Regions:
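Active-site loop/oxyanion-hole signature of alpha/beta-hydrolase fold enzymes
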Residues: 2, 32, 37, 41-69, ...
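Flexible "cap/lid" loop of the alpha/beta hydrolase fold
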Residues: 70, 74-106
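Conserved alpha/beta-hydrolase catalytic His-Asp/Glu region
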Residues: 88-91, 105-161
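Serine-hydrolase catalytic-loop signature spanning alpha/beta hydrolases and amidase-signature enzymes
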Residues: 20-30, 42
Length: 224
């Protein structure tokens, strides 16, 4: 099946949107409804193994993190939404068992979503995110991306003096990729980066606080 990215808007400022582990091009909640389509053109893409690209072969890596390294002159700004760092993500034995079992076990996926949103959201919401991830990703890709974002480390290749403006956004109830984690990783690799903590939300602000997320993204992207 041909890949059909979701395009929102027709503005002059183009934005490539890459989803997370449980997402897809069409798994951004209601965020697209609150974006400024007159100023921006957003292209929501499926990663290999997700959405329309579930049958795509090749490697499943967090190579998208290396866009600034590969083509710095083509990136005007970078926004990370609850992003994993360029380093590996340390886990204890229990944590690894939970995450590595998520490819085959829907219950593990639900537990991860519940944990990373502060154990405060409804079962209906959690079940919907789990269902979307099951329907829009292949088991092989889901497992392979975990191994990449949890164990790959290319932080030594990053240049602290990079001039590209960087914004990092996290939710206050996400205990896994918290503000403290960003301060120890992203803000070290990109010393000029900005960090915003969104209130009343965790790891999925596109569902939990979409208006605040859209506002934060576009305030940063829209600056001269």
């Amino acid at each position: 099946m041909a890949h059909s990215p979701l395009t929102v808007g027709s503005g002059d400022h183009h934005v490539l949107a890459l989803h997370g582990w449980f997402g897809s091009a069409r798994g951004w909640g209601s965020l697209p409804d609150y974006l400024d389509g007159s100023a921006f053109t957003y292209v929501f893409m499926d990663l290999r193994g997700y959405g329309d690209r579930q049958q795509a072969g090749g490697e499943f890596t967090k190579a998208s993190h290396q866009v600034l390294l590969q083509a710095p002159d083509r990136v005007r700004k970078l926004v990370g939404i609850n992003p994993v760092p360029a380093t590996s993500v340390p886990m204890d034995e229990q944590g690894w068992a939970l995450f590595s079992g998520a490819a085959a076990q829907a219950g593990n996926r639900a537990a991860i979503i519940d944990f990373t949103t502060g154990n405060k959201l409804s079962k209906t919401f959690i079940d919907q995110v789990v269902r979307h991830s099951l329907d829009h990703s292949s088991v092989g890709a889901f497992g392979a991306y975990l191994r990449s974002w949890a164990t790959d480390d290319f932080s030594s290749s990053l240049k602290p003096d990079h001039a590209t403006p960087v914004k990092v956004i996290v939710g206050e109830t996400d205990p896994a990729l918290s503000a403290a984690v960003m301060e120890q990783t992203w803000l070290v690799f990109f010393p000029g980066a900005e960090l915003t903590v969104l209130a009343n939300g965790g790891h999925y602000p596109m569902f939990e606080t979409p208006v605040a997320l859209a506002t934060c993204i576009e305030e940063f992207l829209g600056r001269e």
